[in-house]
Amino acid sequence: MDIEDRQVLQEPAQIGRTRIFSLFEIISAQKLLVVILIFATLLRVGSALYQGNAVIDLPGIYDQISYDELARRVISGFGFSFATGHWPATRAGEPTAHWSYLYTLYLAVVYVLFGSKPIVARIIQAVIAGVLHPWLSWRIGKRVFGPVTGLVSASLSALYIYFFYYAGGLITETYYIIGILWSIDVAFRLVSQAKKSGRTGISGSYRWRLWIELGIAIGVTVLLRQVILLFLPFLFLWLWWNMSKDTSIPNQSYSLLKRFRWSALRGFFVTVFVILLLIAPVTIHNLRAFHTFVLVNTNSGFAFFWGNHPIYGTHFVGLLPTGAQDYYNLIPKELLPLNEAELDRALLNKGLQFVFDDPMRFVLLSLSRTEEFFKFWPSPQSSLISNISRVGSFGVLLPFMLYGLWISVKLIWKPKNSEHRSEIILLYLFICIYTTIHLISWALIRYRLPVDAVLLIFAAYGLIDLGKRIQFLRKYLPSY
């Protein structure tokens, strides 16, 4: 726990003076946070127990069947392969890089240690998520909008139906969201410590540790889902722009080097080196398996090809009627003899050709994905669990997310809030860039969940603001 955390936890009286929730007046911030983490963990463990020891097709988490089979194949000595033909177009016994190596190994390790019992992997994941996810939401919310918002943000993350439902599923979403929040938290700490270093004499070694931690956070996140790579240039650009001057640079040369923010550039090299170190084993494995370069996974080409296929016209459909077979039939037959890596690359080229052939259709198709990506209403095609999760989480909190975004814009333009302006902008960047990535490729509700994790911070800020306004209005309401 860093210095700022201890300062916040030692100021429960300040939280009580907000007079928004009387509970804050009798329970310290530290105790309240612990209660939130315990409750979040219980909800997620409950979800894990509900999903049980059987690995079956449940709404939104069908991929757990693939991960479970892959893990069992790995510990049986067959490597990353399937016994029969498998999604997306992997032949029996042939290597696959379509699925997260890291998550597969997580399941394999659990199965080796505790036997092939999926429920154990579910419970371990639920406990980790129950602690880390709300805790990171608290840290980010507290840093950007204050300690009360941090606590409300942690509470919303704990109660969000999607999050505790997916925490019990054997898929990458839960750890992936934690990895994204961890990366954002480290980025915030880096900029904060860089700004303080000149004033407080914070050691440079601490800052280097943060650059290394950022590399680990991003590396783990990439190994869970490589799509986050597309956000990294924007994250690094934000870091580069917001790093303050490096006091180690001599005064006579500072004016030139300041423009390049030399301290940030050096840090980037360290972070990128750590990332490459983490993903290198995967890249080397892929080279040996497919005899061609694959950085992490073989799924971007499949997703972009299927997501932009002319079969949709200008209106995207989340899932085609007969599922996997429909998608398989869309692959040109002359490409099917290729191995998975070669096929992924060929399909990416085909998908790009769809865009070049009809750019306007691509634009309209991308816009049509907003309906699927931001769906908050019940659907007759969805199961009861899906509809309850959708309406009871995103549907209920969407107005507060939008309100929080709206009022946070005003903070950016207030000079007295300049300290947190850059942090709010990074959250905006993530929401916009990550959403755009999926609108131009493949949009499903579960792909939106990392965005939800950030939007909940704005929802918390909006709720706090509304609480203050309601309290203010009470003074002018007649009493009976």
Regions found by a protein language model. Name each.
Residues 121-128, 152-190, 208, 220-234, ...:
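Multi-pass, polyprenyl lipid-linked donor-dependent membrane glycosyltransferases
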Residues 119, 131-159, 177-178, 204, ...:
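Transmembrane-helix signature of polytopic, membrane-embedded enzymes
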Residues 97, 101-108, 114-132, 154, ...:
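Loop-to-helix entry region of an early transmembrane alpha helix in multi-pass inner-membrane enzymes
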Residues 293-368:
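Membrane-proximal stem/loop segments at transmembrane-domain junctions that anchor or position
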Residues 183-213, 240-251, 463-466:
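Membrane-interface transmembrane helices that cradle and orient dolichyl/undecaprenyl
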Residues 123-145, 182, 186, 399-403:
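Transmembrane-helix motifs of polytopic, lipid-linked glycan transferases
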Residues 120-123, 127, 346-347, 353-431:
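Membrane-interface anchor segments at the N-terminal boundary of transmembrane helices
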Residues 1-49, 244, 256-274, 423, ...:
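Start-transfer (signal-anchor) and selected internal transmembrane alpha helices
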